[in-house]
Amino acid sequence: MKLQTTYPSNNYPIFVEHGAIDHISTYIDQFDQSFILIDEHVNQYFADKFDDILSYENVHKVIIPAGEKTKTFEQYQETLEYILSHHVTRNTAIIAVGGGATGDFAGFVAATLLRGVHFIQVPTTILAHDSSVGGKVGINSKQGKNLIGAFYRPTAVIYDLDFLKTLPFEQILSGYAEVYKHALLNGESTTQEIEQHFKDREILQSLNGMDKYIAKGIETKLDIVVADEKEQGVRKFLNLGHTFGHAVEYNHKIAHGHAVMIGIIYQFIVANILFNSNHDIQHYINYLTKLGYPLETITDIDFETIYQYMLSDKKNDKQGVQMVLIKHFGDIVVQHIDQTTLQHACEQLKTYFK
């Protein structure tokens, strides 16, 4: 499947298919030099898939740390200095091969190297079906996740579904959180459909039907980011579950998707408090437990600590913490939430796990 962005200009293709990696070679010839920034774990499993590409004299491989460990100032400087030592021009490509963190990091390198060079995303996880599309790139600060970054469109996204075959179950769980988030944004019928399809751990682990829902998720995100690239309006909806989730992820060092799922449950509780919504919290807890999410992290949450991270969230403004909330399916809002309500919701969340 080939999707295409529909901005007024500077559009890019998104290839979603088995064997999509073959498209990389069609781009290599266009650049003076290319640097493949590859996650160390992906390199262990799939190094041979890039042998043909690396046979080009102008293509270099840079192995970077896996996951969020790569999104540091130190790794950023080291990578830039290595690339600059090759006397690059602006007709250079940075090719990100890995999960969401790899794409974030490599994209920020591309955005800032010589004030911007070509950037190709080659996501290798389910989670990265979300982050590879839309142009958000960045690294982390001691104050929180993704606080240093840019909006920078890729030249192409090449999503080879063959990479998913070797994903450990923890990464499947983490990635499914973003697939599920897109279903929630689409509405009640889509949410019910995906819950009925991936109804237990065994089916989710098999990845049966995942191709379809990944493509749907990308289409959902494209509709939103093309309408609001710089996150002034509806693009904020894509942060569903992320305000609380990012804080939990950063403080408890758990997988991104696991934290987002906790954040999704939390926002349902906040919506119930603020709007008298009628979200069935136990339903979502039961569903996520059946899939195998380790929700016991919730019992260890200290609100005051999490709240400090929430205050650093880049979506906030002078009025304080902003959250995306599903009032009812089809009615999504971005709302300022006071500290008392946030604490009350956290206390309620923990009562489900006593």
Curated annotation (Swiss-Prot):
It is an enzyme of class 4 (lyase). Pfam families: DHQ_synthase, DHQS_C. Zn(2+) binds at E178, H242, H256. NAD(+) binds at G100, A101, T102, G103, D104, T124, T125, K136, K145, F163, L164, K165, T166. Keywords: Amino-acid biosynthesis, Aromatic amino acid biosynthesis, Cobalt, Cytoplasm, Lyase, Metal-binding, NAD, Nucleotide-binding, Zinc. The keyword Ubl conjugation does not apply. Its cofactor is Co(2+); Zn(2+); NAD(+). GO terms for cellular component: cytoplasm. Its EC number is 4.2.3.4. Pathway: Metabolic intermediate biosynthesis; chorismate biosynthesis; chorismate from D-erythrose 4-phosphate and phosphoenolpyruvate: step 2/7. The keyword Protein transport does not apply. It catalyses: 7-phospho-2-dehydro-3-deoxy-D-arabino-heptonate = 3-dehydroquinate + phosphate. GO terms for biological process: amino acid biosynthetic process; aromatic amino acid family biosynthetic process; chorismate biosynthetic process. Catalyzes the conversion of 3-deoxy-D-arabino-heptulosonate 7-phosphate (DAHP) to dehydroquinate (DHQ). Belongs to the sugar phosphate cyclases superfamily. Dehydroquinate synthase family. HAMAP family: DHQ_synthase. This is 3-dehydroquinate synthase. The gene is aroB.
